[in-house]
Amino acid sequence: MDSQLYYRSRCQLVDLAAKYFIPLRQSYRFKAKEVLFRAQGYGHAKQYRRMHKQVKVLKNYLGRVCRDIERYCANTAFAAEDLMQALCHANRLLSQQKRDKNKLYSLHAPEVECISKGKARKRYEFGVKVSLVTTSKQGWVLAAKALHDNPHDGHTLSESIDAAIKNTGVMPEYGFVDRGYRGHSETRLQVFMSGQRRGVTKSIKRWLKRRSAIEPVIGHMKQSHGLATNRLKGKVGDQINALSAAIGYNFALLLNKLSPT
């Protein structure tokens, strides 16, 4: 992933330099492509030491192009907005370390974050967290909100319940959540977690089994209602996409209920 980012950032800077007639000592247009393919080949063959050497070469190419443009801008006081933004992204890429927080994962969508899934098949996802509140019985989506800066699930529960109350005008009596919500501070309703034993009656136990019914809702919203791929730009676009997916899912559920078959 780093090799692709270094390559694309260098391409972006070279194209902008050509647009504004900024002279470069070398653009590395052909050499960088060759090094990128070599790095990807080594990665596919699991020759990681060789791969990291090629990634370092791509990083050096980006740094040289970046410094050329910065020197030109400093000497001529030139400051185009798109060029400054591309330089900012390039410097952010060059300075970030392996274990840094708030890393840059995408040039066209800088707000993208790395979300740890904790699953063997898919350990990480890249995007923005979305919090969903659904009814336990029929699975209507009551609230959908994009959560930036990758917050802990337990810190988002009160905010999600507030959105559900605002949308429906009804105060829920119980909430059923998974174990990711440990450490929450919600006190307005009784919250039960998956695997909880204390205070769980037979009735609550039956409702707690319904908690997993939200998983296919998330799957349907991702596959059929555009939640998996957001084509709207920026943080506002993330919020609009989450709401649109929830509205689309609710309409599909409503049509299914109204259909005669």
Each model region followed by its residue ranges:
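Compositionally biased, low-complexity linear motifs
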Residues: 1-16, 225-238, 243
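Polybasic low-complexity intrinsically disordered regions
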Residues: 1-173, 179
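Helix-centered, glycine/charged polyanion-binding patches within enzymatic domains
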Residues: 166-236, 240
